[in-house]
Amino acid sequence: MKINSPLEAYKYLPQTNCGECGQPTCMAFASTLIDRSGKTTDCPPLIKEKKFAKKLAELDRLLAPEIRQVTIGVGERAANIGGDDVLYRHKLTFFNKTKMFFDVADNMDEAAIVERVKKISDYKKFYVGRNLLLDGVAIRAASNDPAKFATAVKKVIENTELPVILCSFNPAVLKAGLEVAKGKNPLLYAANKDNWKEVGELALEYNVPVVVSAFNDLDGLKTLAKTFAEAGIKDIVLDPGTYPTGKGLKDTFTNFLKIRRAGIMGDTEIAYPIMAMPLTAWMAGIADPVSASYWETVLSSIFTIRYGDIMLLHSMEPYATMPEVHLAETIYTDPRSPVAVDSKMYKVGNPTADSPVLFTTNFALTYYTVESDLASNGIDCWLLAVNTDGIGVEAAAAGGQLTADKVKDAFEKSGFDLKSDVTHNSVVIPGLAARLQGDIEDKLNVKVMVGPMDSGRLPGWMEKNWPPKK
């Protein structure tokens, strides 16, 4: 994105404040364009009226991310990769979390293919209020047989809505897979110095994204990308090679940095998403599968942190997948807006009028930790999330985001009446907010009980202190 101010975007808008975009003014709409919550297509006059055509074209150029965004697959589970504007998250944010594709091979039994595909599709890990999922299936042509590969591709797409990558350096094999996957917008892997012409023709014929590959050869990689772009292929992914150990790993890491830095700094010929292949850990001569899986996770972590937009992985063991999806979720959290839950009164279990009332902040990690500690120990209660702008208890209490007035306001907005909805007229507050006890008692005219410093101690605390003494 070559502009970062709503004022700069505003110059290219109709400036009529018609409201057709859903915003009250064109300046408000310009703000949505800058933070990427809105698109130029949301402005009907800009799209429909010919007099704005030049402004629209220029605005689209200015708003385009420095790294091209590429879409793989179709429908709700389509995977968007790339689309970044910065090298460091704190300067804006990272967009389009690293996508993780897990492999199947066409020489596996059909039943084994189906089982693995369903395992990939059904993977779900609840974390801080959302489900973390896997993103797609990479189908490897281990047999190098077009017919066998086509059968495997057919079996995969019959059993999942996830996007797929067709993996082979043999154009005939890729063509067989493309025939089966028509309309699914698969990613082709890959074009190299030997097959680039044939694979490029396939990408154009079937209108699908394609990977260009040159192992540890950035000049060759750039040449391939430039050649494909000049041929009219827009959706390109870069594979500089992923060496799993030693100097090769160091070179791989350096190549990722060079590619992304060049793209962000304006070299459009190489400003494309980057593919990492942590599954090369299984080719590093590590005999023990647990150790190989561990090293694959290490590689995944390295390239999640440093510019890997899409990854090919193998191990489906929980000890491998959990850290991979957790790290990606953490790195791609938007620093401009802390992860928060709605500020309201929540029921934990099946609370009654005799159940305890507690509050915490609306920082998602804090809320779900407290809620989990209560629910897992069978404590039925009322739990209020106070709006602290997504800040945890200790920091919010110290910084003024958590005050007695904020707590009172949260109770009032929730519609929960401590005098009529419960029989005990008591509130349990976090131990880290003990300093607020007196103020809350004065503001709410209730009995305030100071809970433990850590929500993990709530079960023991409840046994000793609940119900409150009259």
Curated annotation (Swiss-Prot):
E.C. code: 2.1.1.245
Residue ranges constituting the 4Fe-4S domain according to the UniProt record: 1-60
Top-level taxon of origin: Archaea
Keyword Cytoplasm: no
Matches recorded under PANTHER family: ACETYL-COA DECARBONYLASE_SYNTHASE COMPLEX SUBUNIT GAMMA, PTHR36214
Keyword tags: 4Fe-4S, Cobalt, Iron, Iron-sulfur, Metal-binding, Methanogenesis, Methyltransferase, Transferase
Subunit structure: Heterodimer of delta and gamma chains. The ACDS complex is made up of alpha, epsilon, beta, gamma and delta chains with a probable stoichiometry of (alpha(2)epsilon(2))(4)-beta(8)-(gamma(1)delta(1))(8).
Cofactor binding note from Swiss-Prot or TrEMBL: Binds 1 [4Fe-4S] cluster.
Protein known as: Acetyl-CoA decarbonylase/synthase complex subunit gamma 2
Origin species: Methanosarcina mazei (strain ATCC BAA-159 / DSM 3647 / Goe1 / Go1 / JCM 11833 / OCM 88) (Methanosarcina frisia)
Gene name for this UniProt entry: cdhE2
NCBIfam families: PRK04165.1
Gene3D superfamilies documented for this protein: 3.40.50.11600, Dihydropteroate synthase-like
Pathway entry: One-carbon metabolism; methanogenesis from acetate
Molecular function, one GO term: 4 iron, 4 sulfur cluster binding
GO annotation terms (biological process): acetyl-CoA catabolic process; methanogenesis, from acetate; methylation
